[in-house]
């Protein structure tokens, strides 16, 4: 049947969506239809402990060729709460057996505090427990421009106290994970997994920046904050009361 469709000249949906050429032979990137793509992920241990509203917004506003992908997976409360309780009890037992001058002591103390915080938030504040995975996609027309943009993203993440890792030898899997198929590669998911509660997840909502972009507007310039075009149509009566809004 496939040969008949091919000989008959029929075009399927897969033919329209699939790229014409894919080069997977490089460690640092993948080339899809002559566009270079590279991917990074925020390590599971690489997040800030306390975050504010719009804490992912700087990555969304990173400029041309930078895209953000994040995945959330809600966990059942009846399974998570017992696990947190057991882990906290185990850490308390281990803490009694080590001296307070060892580095392990501070790590266990931090783990116990985190466990108690999560239990309190879930029991008293009715928050839900999620696993979050964050990937950053970078694209460019050349390998040199791609490397420049990757370096800029790494510098930006360092300023946000985020630890990012490149998906070396896994850019094909990362590219597949970036497609709207709700399928994250298990190896990347394992390295990028971070637990998060409802409030912090809501604060990750990235669309917090302002923009002015009328479809038939006149270009006034570029937004310095997120590199978006500033375009205003002063004669659009449905948006503005007077055409002399800008002089």
Regions flagged by a language model, labelled:
Residues 1-209:
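Extended, folded cores of ATP/NTP-driven motor/assembly subunits in large transport
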Residues 215-247:
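Glycine-rich phosphate-binding loop of nucleotide-binding enzymes
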Residues 198, 203, 207-214, 222, ...:
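Generic structural "secondary-structure junction" signal
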């Amino acid at each position: 049947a496939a040969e008949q469709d091919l000989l008959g000249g029929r075009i399927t949906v897969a033919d329209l969506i699939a790229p014409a050429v894919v080069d997977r032979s490089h460690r640092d990137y993948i080339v899809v239809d002559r566009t270079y793509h590279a991917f990074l992920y925020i390590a599971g241990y690489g997040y800030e402990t306390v975050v504010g509203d719009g804490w992912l917004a700087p990555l969304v506003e990173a400029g041309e060729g930078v895209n953000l992908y994040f995945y959330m997976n809600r966990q059942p409360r009846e399974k998570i709460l017992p696990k947190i309780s057991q882990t906290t009890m185990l850490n308390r037992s281990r803490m009694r057996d080590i001296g307070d001058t060892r580095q392990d002591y501070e790590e266990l103390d931090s783990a116990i505090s985190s466990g108690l915080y999560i239990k309190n938030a879930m029991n008293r504040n009715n928050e839900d427990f999620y696993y979050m995975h964050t990937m950053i996609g970078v694209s460019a027309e050349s390998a040199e421009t791609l490397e420049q943009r990757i370096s800029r993203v790494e510098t930006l993440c360092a300023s946000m106290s985020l630890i990012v890792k490149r998906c070396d030898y896994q850019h094909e899997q990362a590219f597949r994970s970036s497609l709207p198929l709700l399928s994250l590669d298990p190896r990347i998911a394992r390295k990028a997994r971070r637990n998060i509660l409802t409030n912090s997840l809501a604060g990750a909502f990235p669309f917090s920046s302002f923009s002015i972009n009328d479809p038939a507007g006149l270009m006034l310039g570029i937004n310095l904050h997120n590199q978006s075009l500033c375009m205003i149509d002063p004669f659009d009566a449905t948006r503005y009361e007077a055409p002399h809004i800008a002089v």
